[in-house]
């Protein structure tokens, strides 16, 4: 039985009860994708991108949740942990549900990245990450309820916790300030 107290389910219920036909995974992917493309962390710009996916302007409760999500992501991307926490169903959800959400997360990421990358030059490694995300978004139905399927899911999820950081460090991470010249 799925954990009704999980952040994913709570966010899904909030979105659904406010008439937004989108999953938390897709919204989180959108946010991470746009952030990794260098969109910055301006709340109004994030809310404008999110409103396209939500299909309507968010009310105050959803708006506040989206701003909170952005603050969490900002902290993760700017920390030294070198991993992000994916907003996905908990481990007690059916593997098919988790795999579907993983694919939706990747679709959201690709959309967010595409809306904000604006023709930036990418390294070969960054292009490989984007190709991987496209492939993962399309194979969500391929995982079977088995130990191998579970293992494959965990492997992909671990990859997605670190791979976007390559894009963020390449395109969005602020450069370290140059040392100030000293006066002699």
Curated annotation (Swiss-Prot):
InterPro entries: YgfB-like, YgfB-like_sf
GO cellular component, one term: cytosol
Domain of life: Bacteria
Similarity section: Belongs to the UPF0149 family.
Entry-linked NCBIfam families: PRK02166.1
Record's protein name: UPF0149 protein PputGB1_5261
Annotated organism of origin: Pseudomonas putida (strain GB-1)
């Amino acid at each position: 039985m799925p954990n009704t107290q999980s952040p994913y389910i709570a966010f899904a219920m909030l979105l659904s009860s406010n008439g937004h036909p989108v999953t938390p995974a897709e919204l989180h992917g959108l946010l991470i994708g746009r952030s990794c493309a260098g969109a910055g962390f301006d709340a109004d710009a994030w809310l404008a991108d999110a409103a396209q996916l939500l299909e309507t302007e968010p009310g105050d409760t959803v708006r506040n949740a989206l701003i909170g999500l952005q603050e969490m992501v900002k902290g993760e991307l700017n920390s030294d942990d070198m991993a992000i926490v994916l907003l996905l169903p908990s481990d007690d959800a059916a593997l098919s549900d988790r795999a579907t959400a993983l694919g939706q997360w990747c679709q959201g990421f690709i959309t967010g990245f595409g809306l904000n990358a604006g023709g930036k030059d990418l390294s070969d490694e960054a292009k490989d990450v984007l190709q991987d995300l496209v492939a993962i978004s399309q194979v969500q139905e391929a995982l079977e309820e088995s130990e191998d399927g579970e293992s494959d899911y965990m492997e992909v999820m671990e990859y997605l916790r670190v791979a976007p950081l390559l894009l963020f460090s390449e395109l969005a991470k602020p450069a370290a300030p140059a040392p100030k010249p000293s006066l002699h």
